[in-house]
Design a protein with these regions (language model features):
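Well-ordered alpha/beta subsegment
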Residues: 128-155
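Short Gly/charged-rich anion-binding patches and loops
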Residues: 43-44, 61, 93, 144
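Beta-strand/loop substructures that line and gate deep hydrophobic ligand-binding cavities in soluble
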Residues: 104-131
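Terminal, regulation- and interaction-focused segments at domain boundaries
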Residues: 22-53
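Short, Lys/Arg-enriched N-terminal segments with co-localized hydrophobic residues
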Residues: 1-2, 8-22
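Compact, glycine-rich, soluble single-domain proteins
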Residues: 58-106
Length: 155
């Protein structure tokens, strides 16, 4: 609800994009256009996490890995992050939600659309794992992800 009002949901459902490409995705994804290059937006993400004192667990630069394999793909990076004080409560509620933690955000250059932020839809995850949407740790996570995406994408 909170996130839905602030973030655009992508519903590709095999529909052509603006440029006529057919794109596919699954439920549970929230996306948001961001101002700036992948590098600029990525740096804003890392700085935002640091400012909010959220531990960065890992990063993956898929484009760099592709180049190392002699391949090309648009700039695409993933940040894995989270606070155990929040995520642990979710895992105590439903241990299998550990598959979704730590949280992650993808920053990617999408041809024809520009720099995009992709992240899990927290309410969808709650439904998937049968977690009460009113659970305090879930509400904190929902608000946190909206705050981070707003700061990172320049809203």
């Amino acid at each position: 609800v909170f996130m839905e009002s602030r973030l655009r949901r992508r519903d590709f459902s095999n529909k052509p994009s603006k440029k006529g490409m057919v794109m596919h995705t699954t439920e549970g994804l929230v996306s948001k256009p961001c101002a700036g290059s992948v590098e600029t937006v990525w740096n804003r993400l890392l700085e935002t996490l640091k400012t909010l004192n959220v531990p960065l667990c890992a990063t993956v630069d898929h484009a760099a890995n592709a180049r190392a394999a002699g391949l090309f793909m648009p700039e695409t990076r993933v940040a894995f992050f989270g606070k155990p004080a929040v995520g642990t409560h979710l895992m105590l509620e439903r241990p299998e939600v550990a598959l979704e933690l730590p949280l992650r955000i993808v920053i990617s250059e999408v041809p024809g659309e520009g720099t995009m932020l992709f992240m899990p839809d927290i309410l969808w995850l709650a439904h998937r794992y049968g977690i009460d949407p009113q659970l305090d740790s879930l509400r904190k996570t929902l608000g946190f992800m909206a705050l981070v995406s707003d700061k990172v994408c320049g809203d």
